[in-house]
């Protein structure tokens, strides 16, 4: 045998010619790692090369098989530390059927999902006017990309309208204050002063009107006062102070038998799946011990032994269960004892005890569960826990996430569950007798999946950046490995995190094509997961419902940002398309809101879970109210949008506002306080054809800038200047001042010179706006509240008979600007420029401009 034949040839283990992505796409691959094509398409994380030797992908860690906790693998079975190798035993018939269904659903979902190949990045700027940061006495806030404030700051039309509205309200409050008519309520925040004052003035006018005396006036007076008092009581209760020595648990808690039979039974059956952070057997044990030692024996609540945390958990569970029954609208006889429990002081008690511990330094198991329950309550409760735009939720959420990481509740409880080594001390609560290491891992998984989803959820709702920066690709082998809905959603976490990164890594340069592709992937995968759960005894329909609405909300906010970008970029074709797409999305979401309120049986949402689903519906409906004015203010720029179409949009806004505030305004503090500015916005937009709202807003703000320059502005010198609050108006003023010797119509300057997309003609693209009247009909024929009190139409609205009596004198002294108001929009820029008005005349004229917007029927006493 020759030498060559005796030497064994060494086999080369070279990588395949292309990465798995390029192989799937049938595209070119430069064989770098990651390859250039994947870098360009944003698929860096999934750019994988398969080797001939092992056949294992070189990818980020993934959880391919999450075995039950008590079936730990031996070291020989592990392919790598913490990850369990797939066993070669044949699958059961049930597992085969399960994954056969997955493949069938994937093929079905492909009918409506078309993957995008070789799509070049397309970047848009979601912060054309920068980030929106607000500082005030009590808090500083950087608002997320999709909050109301950020949307208004991004949109020049909404920004100008909101600026005008705030200045007009300030002037009116100064007018009332000088007359001694301002109203204050010590239990309400300072921002409520305008609401109370305007409503009191409204009430005075109604009481003076003989026509309105009687039932209408008494109803107005009773309902309005009760709402102000109700929300003032919320704040007073939550601000109550306690002394630990005087707190007796039996004064606040029902007997143990009632707690177990009514409260815990309801919690376990209907609510636990929403917040599955407990082992219910262990929780019941701790509650029983607490009642035996504290309630029945009358012992003081021990902070050292963490009795106070068990007490807080009981209080929060009772309050959450009571909310469930309260918002279900079921007969009070179903849970009579529960509804009799006074929970008004519970939140103040919880806050008192939470800060008795070193919550900012260290955390234990019960304390973490209490914090999570508090976060859940802030989300669902009618009090203003999260703030009107969820801007106050990140600090508590950050505390929860930090506490989880400090306690070892993280991705390791899924990827390396066998690596945890516990030392459970004798005084730990829950004790070792009742809670073993395997129980810890089980609850750790439940808590981490819950906290993780809420972190991702807030990114989709408000556009804020996720606080948990790590994700893993999770694939569970059996349905038994996903005991909660949140654990099942871990398979979507990688996609949700990619969406967050694409959005927040650089908001000024967001890859829109990649974002659309990721959203489509998320919809497709969620559709598969949702379909797989249909055979379960408990479908958890409210979770699927919320997830669908969250995705729709994200799409709505993104569409608005997309439209604004095309407008700034003067991309007329894409602007028109996004304008129509955004309007269609608004109509679609509004229909969903209508069905939620008036056809809820078809949604298959349990009425006892509505206290939870109400929150996402409230956020989505409010977003519609924020965005619709942007369409109305832009209406004059489209030939195909006539005045009659704008009136339909305004009627639609009125209908959506009536539904939103009548369904939520009586109960939710944050909705009630938004009603004031929403009503003002409606009055701004609901103008006659001659008094175009956008022209009047521009004119008012230009006059205000002139007053600032002359030092005669009503704005306090401690406040920011208009030119700093709304820089786009300062730029517009500079453009207007270029027309020396001429006085053109300001709308012509705005559309043709300053904001040049308006100069394009609809005929250039063949664009024809589709109003979708048929889909809007429920809101145009708003008869739902015709036979009962409509809170939206009632608040801040004077009787029409007040018009003549209060405006006759004002009309005689006002300097009207009817000629300017009636100027055609497309007027040629050739008229001589009239001399500037004196400062005093500017002030009178400015109030006249406010009268053009606010019908004297509403705010006649201010002039």
Swiss-Prot record:
Residues 52-63 have a biased composition (Polar residues). Residues 52-81 are annotated as: Disordered. InterPro entries: OAF3, Zn2-C6_fun-type_DNA-bd_sf, Zn2Cys6_DnaBD. SUPFAM superfamilies: Zn2/Cys6 DNA-binding domain. It is found in: Cytoplasm; Nucleus; Mitochondrion. Gene3D superfamilies: Zn(2)-C6 fungal-type DNA-binding domain. Keywords: Cytoplasm, DNA-binding, Metal-binding, Mitochondrion, Nucleus, Repressor, Transcription, Transcription regulation, Zinc. GO terms for cellular component: mitochondrion; nucleus. CDD domains: fungal_TF_MHR, GAL4. It comes from the Eukaryota. The keyword Nucleus applies. Belongs to the OAF3 family. PANTHER family: OLEATE ACTIVATED TRANSCRIPTION FACTOR 3 (PTHR31069:SF33), OLEATE-ACTIVATED TRANSCRIPTION FACTOR 1-RELATED (PTHR31069). Transcriptional inhibitor with a significantly increased number of target genes in response to oleate. This is Oleate activated transcription factor 3.
